[in-house]
């Protein structure tokens, strides 16, 4: 028998209520539930749901993982420049998937910086709205973030910044960053990456931050230059559950401070339920559903953990959270929203999160 401290917040029909509770739960109950255009056309012709990747000569099946490695605490700044790490963490990013880039070369980043800058200025001169004020011009910086790649097949991360100076700024005023984005691949599917033709580079995950109009221009330039295509990358309920479990698994080495889950229930009008659990209680529940002390976490363990939380809630409120959809997960280590937004608050477990997002991007691609 152990206790779970949790806070319950719900909004329904414009009314909001908050409740705090301590509930005792028997452990055995939880345990019982325990590149050419022809290449792009050929990719688009595949059905997304099949998760088949077109490569030169054969189809590669991209399988949904049923287990993942337990998170390992690691000082990423020993591998990656701390200044570059600071650019990635403690910011909210919008996620997209990217199909393989044709003839992309990490050695040509300086040239790409000039060409993208000229493209943005050209589009602005044609009267396209940029929505970042009255700027004199744009400067683009491409750079490589060395050290995030986990395997030899992973391409190194590319970081992009767009800077601009306001029209009425003093001459010596520094340009300010108006848009940021990065393309990455962390522990990508080896079979898929190895089967790509040598002319293609796979950086399937794009994270962006800034005006949507600039995001559209950046994507447009990439599509024209590297014959690729982009799409929104939402994070479904199953992957949000994975994130919750992986973050809870970090608690023994770093205090996650809280676990907040948001469900949307299919009522009229829809009801949002915000469910905040004390981190130690969440960890004890997680520890109780773990089958053994292995280095892997299985989907069955994640399912039992979420069902355990749902059973706590149902026992007290008679509200069946499983009837709804998990929309958001938050801890002190980061947060994620089903619409495709992610915030990584700590660099300690950044590779664990990026690996999961890389998998999501590869599975989402229409190839």
Give the predicted meaning of each segment:
Residues 2-192, 341-367:
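N-terminal low-complexity/intrinsically disordered pre-sequences and tails
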